[in-house]
Amino acid sequence: MTTNYIFVTGGVVSSLGKGIAAASLAAILEARGLNVTIMKLDPYINVDPGTMSPIQHGEVFVTEDGAETDLDLGHYERFIRTKMSRRNNFTTGRIYSDVLRKERRGDYLGATVQVIPHITNAIKERVLEGGEGHDVVLVEIGGTVGDIESLPFLEAIRQLAVDIGREHALFMHLTLVPYLAAAGEVKTKPTQHSVKELLSIGIQPDILICRSDRAVPANERAKIALFCNVPEKAVISMKDVDSIYKIPGLLKSQGLDDYICKRFSLNCPEANLSEWEQVIYEEANPAGEVTIGMVGKYIELPDAYKSVIEALKHGGLKNRVTVNIKLIDSQDVETRGVEILKDLDAILIPGGFGYRGVEGKIATARYARENNIPYLGICLGMQVALIEFARNVAGMDNANSTEFVPDCKYPVVALITEWRDEDGNVEVRSEKSDLGGTMRLGAQQCQLSDDSLVRQLYGAPTIVERHRHRYEVNNMLLKQIEAAGLRVAGRSGDDQLVEIIEVPNHPWFVACQFHPEFTSTPRDGHPLFAGFVKAANEHQKRQAK
């Protein structure tokens, strides 16, 4: 089987939506019956985004095999059925790390190690490896054409197109076509200069995606085609839309998938986008709305919680309600009190690290528990719920996590000291271990209690969810907390770790150590988020009586 590659680049400015465009195109090709995957090549020096600040980089998306990756991989999984893995995302740092390791081993037999050919060859090898077994692979190059950091990646894909043959390679370039109100027209010059920059490094784009706040007129697309040496039918207008799930239909309506299939000589049926049409219909025709408060520490950049926000919206789709998300800084709860949590239909505390704002999260969990407000805690959101219950119900004064107070009297949350590494070997860790790549990561099995709420929601006794954490419930103190009324609703496959807790005498109080947001999609939703939004809707109706 021959694999075809579409290399996706961006020009003029960053944040044009390369990831959404690539994912939308992949969704159309998948709807035509093709086996599609998407890769993201990031030009930063970090080995992976695992230790990067969420305020700088946004969320870290965790794959089933435990890779800490760019948030764009979350978009990919929400648009196509193919699951991402560590093969789908790599960085400059990862490439250099691998090349330097080989150099130290003597693999290069004393040769002078250079960007060309050693770095570019390493990039090409990873791209080809990631594409194995697929009909079409979309490869998104992070950054903007012209950035010095992107040059090795651009050179590598230029070479790769020659290696595999131009009949199996396409270059798709996203570019900004701004509208100037003073002139009353869109301007094509930035696009022309962006293509000129690409040409200077040996890449002639085959497709141009023109990003604008409005549809780019046919005459302007013809002008772009003429000056950029691209067929007119390959100049695609991608205007701003009120829902990202409309983009597959927008691209298909302009024949982008037909053009690509003809170029690759792929004989496949027309795309059936009925599932996406259903998503768009549900989104546009809600029967009501709810307001959910999300209490976190990185709220100045909503992308830090991208998958959680999307999963809440998916939960809304399954309940035919619009979910309004109120982002609340947990430090504001500390300084202004729980009064700022009034008038919420439900409360969610997402994952996070570090002590800043933790007491605000603990106060939030208490407020939700004592006032019968639906509560969903994720990762740290479960740990603060446990700490709150231990302090205020189980009589364990000043209970805490050893992450925040190492020598606390009641360490109800503590570091797991023994882990399985990628090869399955036992590895001992401590507070002094490296932060990067030293967490419990990826898909793990969880056994659900028969009498639990989550057992009803999932409809299965065993589930698999993705994790990203170092700290867990301390089993040494668990019996005392359970005796006070807390229910352990889910345990790890080996029965050693607490994965889900519930407060039984509460309308809806669920907290999990894993990250359910990573497996939620607009077409399928997720049982926890669907149940949570339903509980929010029911709470709103009770309050209205």
Swiss-Prot record:
Q: What is its EC number?
A: 6.3.4.2
Query: Region (Amidoligase domain) spans which residues?
Result: 1-266
Binding sites annotated in the UniProt record for Mg(2+): D72, E140
CDD domains recorded for this chain?
CTPS_N, GATase1_CTP_Synthase
Q: Which UniProt keywords apply?
A: ATP-binding, Glutamine amidotransferase, Ligase, Magnesium, Metal-binding, Nucleotide-binding, Pyrimidine biosynthesis
Annotated InterPro entries: Class_I_gatase-like, CTP_synthase, CTP_synthase_N, GATASE, GATase1_CTP_Synthase, P-loop_NTPase
For this record, an example GO cellular component is:
cytosol
A biological process (GO) of this protein is: 'de novo' CTP biosynthetic process
Q: Where is the catalytic site? A: C379, H515, E517
Key word Signal present in the record? no
Annotated L-glutamine binding sites = G352, L380, G381, M382, Q383, E403, R470
Question: What would be an example GO MF term here?
Answer: identical protein binding
Assembly notes: Homotetramer.
What's this chain's function?
Catalyzes the ATP-dependent amination of UTP to CTP with either L-glutamine or ammonia as the source of nitrogen. Regulates intracellular CTP levels through interactions with the four ribonucleotide triphosphates.
Q: Which named protein is this? A: CTP synthase
